[in-house]
Amino acid sequence: MPATVARYITPYFARQRISHCCHNCKLAYWPVCSAMRRLSVVSLLVVCGAADVPWLDTSAEAPERTPPAPEVYARKDAGWRKQHATTAHGRPKSLPPSASPLDRLKLEQFRHPTCHSQAHQLGREIFADERKTRASPDAALDAALGVCEYRCTGGCLHGAVGAYAAARGAPPDIAELCARRAMTQIVGAGECAHAVGHALALLQSEEDALRGCAAAPDYSVAHYCAGGVVMETASTFFGRKRDVRAKCERVPPKTRAACYYFGLRSRASGARNRTAAVEETVKDVCTSKKTYKACVYGAATAFLKNKMHTDVGAQGARFCATLGDATWACIDGLMFRTAKFGSEALRRGACAALRGDAAALCRDVAAAGMYSLRKGALVGSYAEV
C-alpha cells in the first residue's frame, strides 16, 4: 500500500484531508466541498491529490545533526571571556591589532552570539595561518576546520572552505569535500554544500557558480550550494535596482528558491504586521507562474528572519495555509531557519496552527533540520513551473 494512502486510511486522517481540501477551495464551492465529505477515503485521495504533497524522504539520511548552539562556545570559552571582559558590565574588551584570528573569532561570538557573515573573513585568515605550516591545502583545511569548529554558526567554516578552494585554484567537488572526516565531524553534507557555494562564488563568475551548484543531481544539495553563492555575492548579486523577480527568473531552476530567499528574507521581517507585509510581498513580487513557489518560499522566510517569536511563527503558519499548492513551499520557508535559530516552543506553536497534511509536513521539516537532504521532493517542486 502506498505511504500516501496509508497515511489517510483512518477516519481521523480522512476528516483532516477533507478539511484541508475544502479550506484550499476557500469554500467558494461549498456544495462541492459538502459532497466531498461523503466520499470514500480512496475517492477523496483522487480528488485532493495526496500524491502532490512533497513529503520528506526519510530514507535519504538521518535528520541533520543539530550543530552546537552559541551557548556551547560560551561555556567552552568561559575562561577566555572572563579574562577579556570589562569588570563593569561583563562586556568584551577590544583586542590589540596583533590578536590572532581565533581570538578575534572568540571576541566576535562574545559580542554577537549568532554571528555569521562577520566570521567568513576570519575563517579565511585561519586557513592562511594553517597553510604556512602544512604540507598541502587539504591538510591546512582539516586543521582550519578544527580551529573554526562551528563558531559563529558556521561562518568561520564557510570562510575556510572558500580560502581552501582559492588555494587549490579549482572549484571543489561537493561530494568529495563534504565526505572529509574533518568536515563530517562538524556539519552534514547539506551545510557543507552551502560552504562550497561560497567557494564557487570566489573562484568563478556568478553564472558559472550557480551552474556548478545546479549540476548537483540532488535538488537539496543544489539549493543549499546556491545559497552560498548568493550569500557570498550579496553586495552585487541583485544589482543597484534590486529587482529580485527579474534576477531570480533568470537563474537555473534548481537555484531559484535560494535566490528568492536572500532577495526577500529581510523585505518584511521588520514590519509591525508581519503577515500583512509578507502577503504584500507575495502580491508584488510573486507574480510569475514560472517561479511562484520559489518566490513564496523566499517571502515566507521573512516571518522568522529576525525576531523568532512563537506568535509570529503561528501567524506565518496560518498565512501559509491560505496558499493552496504553494502551502508546502511557504511552510518550508517559514521553518527553514528554526532548526538552527529557533526554539522547540516556536516549532511546536507554528505547526500546531496547521491541520492535516500541512501540520504533518511542518513537523517533518522542523525535525529534519535547516540543511537536511530529506527535502529533495520539496525543493524540487520549486524548480517546476
Locate the predicted segments by residue:
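Low-complexity, intrinsically disordered or signal/transmembrane-proximal segments
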Residues: 8, 12, 16, 20-23, ...
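Short, linear, compositionally biased motifs with a strong N-terminal bias
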Residues: 16, 45-46
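Cysteine-centered motifs
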Residues: 21-25, 33, 48
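Sec-dependent signal peptide recognition
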Residues: 37-43
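N-terminal signal peptide
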Residues: 46-54
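Non-catalytic tandem-repeat scaffold regions and their flanking low-complexity/translocation tails
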Residues: 53-385
